[in-house]
Swiss-Prot record:
Biased composition (Polar residues): 56-69, 175-195, 351-361
Complex and partners: Homodimer. Forms a heterodimer with BZIP1, BZIP1, BZIP2, BZIP9, BZIP11, BZIP44, BZIP53 and BZIP63. Interacts with ABI3 and forms a complex made of ABI3, BZIP53 and BZIP25.
UniProt modified residues of type Phosphoserine: 213
Protein's name in the database: Basic leucine zipper 25
Species of the source: Arabidopsis thaliana
Length: 403
């Protein structure tokens, strides 16, 4: 953003507080130490010129001799002058009457060393100089110097530095200042030697962004018609546009990455909660598993103790109770209280009074009921194991059949 001020607004704020002019009768000249507060250190030629002004102003009786003379302040920094001075250079011309000689105010300072008595033509007649005119001359010189510095520093491109330096020298050599008692204003007239080159961009006075102002400058360069400048401007525009696109794309990627990071953080927190729940469940299951194992060991111990008790009481191993098809001898006598013979090889035979038909039927029935006998014997033995006269065997129904 660039804001342009006028030269008058800038320079008037820089003038120091005016000091009273010396009295007409006094011929003393101020010393260099007296003007230190003015902010300017003057050479010997300037002091000679100042003495001439004092002598001329002392001989004048007009009301203009009592005016306040101002000394120009030192030139400010180039960075501030660059922002405030206009781009164009002008030549200052001040009118002067023909009966007065020209004041030595050129920028080279060659005529300042001349004494007032060195001119034989004007030594006889007194010369009257208005301090306001001298103030205007110094002010115009300051403005020209500011404009030259601003044009050289602020608006010249690197490739045109040599050409702009030559233009500055020509502009400084073409400055002419003229004075007149009746005219105290400064008149500016542009010259052809100080015109701006077409490839130098003009500064933007509107308040806008830096990119917009740069684009406008490049558009102005492209409109000038120089092929080199047009190509350079197009290349700069394309580079800036690509930079904008890359910044926009990078910003979109950063936004997308931020969104993904937020989603991943949410998923991470969810997974952490689930993991903590699973850890609690695992701990509870491990505790339950230890409890169940302890219960199983307790039950196994109880089973062993019960088996030992049964074996000690009955004298029979409980494991043999589940053995199938136990061979048990039986007697065909009708007596229910008969005991098992000690000889295991004893074979019971049927009675001789039975007929062949009844004998065959009895054999078939014994075969059919032989499988049910061990279960019944085991059940009766478990129900009353301590009965002294108990019979473990039961007579079959057909044994008591009458023939």
């Amino acid at each position: 953003m660039h804001i342009v001020f006028s030269v008058d607004d800038l320079t008037e704020s820089f003038w120091p507080v005016p000091a009273p002019a010396p009295s007409p009768g006094s011929s003393s000249t101020p010393s260099p130490t007296q003007n230190v507060a003015d902010g300017m250190t003057r050479s010997q030629s300037e002091w000679a010129f100042h003495r001439l002004i004092n002598e001329l102003s002392g001989s004048d009786s007009s009301p203009t001799t009592n005016t306040i003379e101002r000394s120009p302040p030192p030139v400010q920094s180039l960075s501030r002058l660059e922002e405030t001075v206009d781009e164009t250079e002008d030549v200052v011309e001040i009118q002067k009457p023909q009966n007065h000689r020209r004041l030595p105010v050129d920028d080279q300072g060659k005529n300042r060393n001349r004494a007032p008595s060195s001119d034989p033509v004007d030594s006889s007649a007194p010369v009257v100089v208005d301090p306001n005119q001298y103030h205007a001359i110094l002010k115009s010189k300051l403005e020209l110097a500011c404009a030259a510095v601003a044009r050289r520093v602020g608006t010249v491109k690197p490739e045109d530095s040599s050409a702009s330096a030559s233009n500055q020298k020509q502009a400084q050599g073409s400055i002419v200042a003229q004075t007149s008692p009746g005219a105290s204003s400064v008149r500016f007239s542009p010259t052809t030697s100080t015109q701006k080159k077409p490839d130098v961009p003009a500064r933007q006075t509107s308040i806008s962004s830096r990119d917009d102002s740069d684009d406008d400058d490049l558009d102005g360069d492209a409109d000038n018609g120089d092929p080199t400048d047009v190509k350079r401007a197009r290349r700069m525009l394309s580079n800036r546009e690509s930079a904008r696109r890359s910044r926009r794309r990078k910003q979109e990627q950063m936004n997308e990455f931020d969104t993904q990071v937020g989603q991943l953080r949410a998923e991470h927190s969810t997974l952490i909660n689930r993991l903590s729940d699973m850890n609690h469940k695992y701990d509870a299951a491990a505790v339950d598993n230890r409890i169940l194992r302890a219960d199983i060991e307790t039950l196994r111990t109880k089973v062993k103790m019960a088996e030992e008790t049964v074996k000690r009481v009955t004298g029979v191993n409980p494991l043999h109770w589940s053995r199938p098809n136990m061979g048990i001898p039986f007697s065909n006598t009708p007596s229910a209280s008969s005991s098992i013979p000690p000889n295991s090889n004893h074979i019971l035979k049927p009675a001789n009074s039975s007929t062949n038909t009844s004998a065959g039927l009895a054999q078939n029935q014994r075969v059919e009921t032989a499988n049910f006998l061990p279960e019944q014997v085991n059940r009766e033995g478990m129900q009353n194991p301590f009965a002294p006269d108990s019979n473990l065997y039961e007579t079959l129904p057909h044994w008591n059949h009458k023939h």
